[in-house]
A protein has these predicted regions:
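Bulky hydrophobic segments
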Residues: 2-125, 129, 133-146
């Protein structure tokens, strides 16, 4: 009797957790698209009263003297991908989500070519893609070694 009640409570908790993950993924996805397509930096406008300045969470990841990978882009796409992949991990939509995240990471950066006050940068693109790929690797490792 008690275990039946505990099972029901655990199922409800899992459903709520999944709903919150899905809501978080879609909310962050919408916010990311708005921030990416805005001409200039909304954070720069707010923090520095200058829409041309992009705040940095940490310094970029340096690959060589001439090249770096944008850390901000890595962090944002890592978080978005983690929410999306782990929200949909036990559904038929997981492959779609992975493809969507990879395409989103590429398309949003390519759109900077035509958006005023924005510029396409290879380091940003690689930061986006690496954020997604790192979460995919974590998801694959989790699936191999951890029982749901």
């Amino acid at each position: 009797m008690i275990t039946d009640k505990n099972d029901k409570i655990n199922k409800i908790i899992v459903k709520i957790k999944n709903k919150l993950l899905i809501l978080g993924f879609h909310s962050l996805n919408l916010i990311l698209i708005i921030f990416y397509l805005y001409p200039g930096s909304l954070f720069g406008c707010y923090l520095y009263n200058n829409c041309n300045i992009q705040p940095q969470i940490t310094g970029n990841f340096i690959v060589s003297f001439n090249y770096s990978i944008a850390s901000n882009h890595f962090y944002v796409f890592f978080i978005l991908s983690a929410l999306g992949i782990f929200a949909y991990q036990n559904t038929k939509k997981i492959k779609f989500i992975i493809i969507y995240l990879l395409l989103l990471s590429i398309i949003l950066e390519l759109l900077h070519i035509i958006i005023p006050l924005r510029a396409f940068e290879w380091g940003d693109l690689f930061g986006n893609i690496l954020g997604v790929i790192f979460v995919i690797i974590i998801y694959k490792i989790k699936g191999k070694y951890v029982q749901n």
